Amino acid sequence: MGRSLKKGPYCSPKLLARIEEMNEKDQKRVVKTWSRRSTIFPQMIGHTIAVYDGRKHVPVYVTEEMVGHKLGEFAPTRTYRGHGHHTERSTALK
């Protein structure tokens, strides 16, 4: 279930303030955030935001197509390494 339309999209006030400040000063530096739930706003286009995935901060460069999505969508929390493979030892046991 998504967020109610009457409430509008959510973005962390601290993150939004940092982005606005960087836009005013015309700066481009990486902004670290733990707020995966924040919606990407048009003001964020062109900035790199380091989103925490539970282990490290993943740099996400914001493009126009990302507006309206959540930051967490672009920093996966789980890495799938595949199922176990057959080895010489495991096939010899049969």
UniProtKB/Swiss-Prot annotation:
Entry superkingdom: Bacteria
SUPFAM superfamilies the record matches: Ribosomal protein S19
GO CC entries: cytoplasm; small ribosomal subunit
Biological processes per GO annotation: ribosomal small subunit assembly; translation
InterPro entries per the UniProt record, alphabetical: Ribosomal_uS19, Ribosomal_uS19_bac-type, Ribosomal_uS19_CS, Ribosomal_uS19_SF
A GO molecular-function annotation: rRNA binding
Keywords, ordered alphabetically: Ribonucleoprotein, Ribosomal protein, RNA-binding, rRNA-binding
Entry-linked Pfam families: Ribosomal_S19
UniProt record similarity statement: Belongs to the universal ribosomal protein uS19 family.
Function: Protein S19 forms a complex with S13 that binds strongly to the 16S ribosomal RNA.
The protein's name: Small ribosomal subunit protein uS19
Organism: Desulforudis audaxviator (strain MP104C)
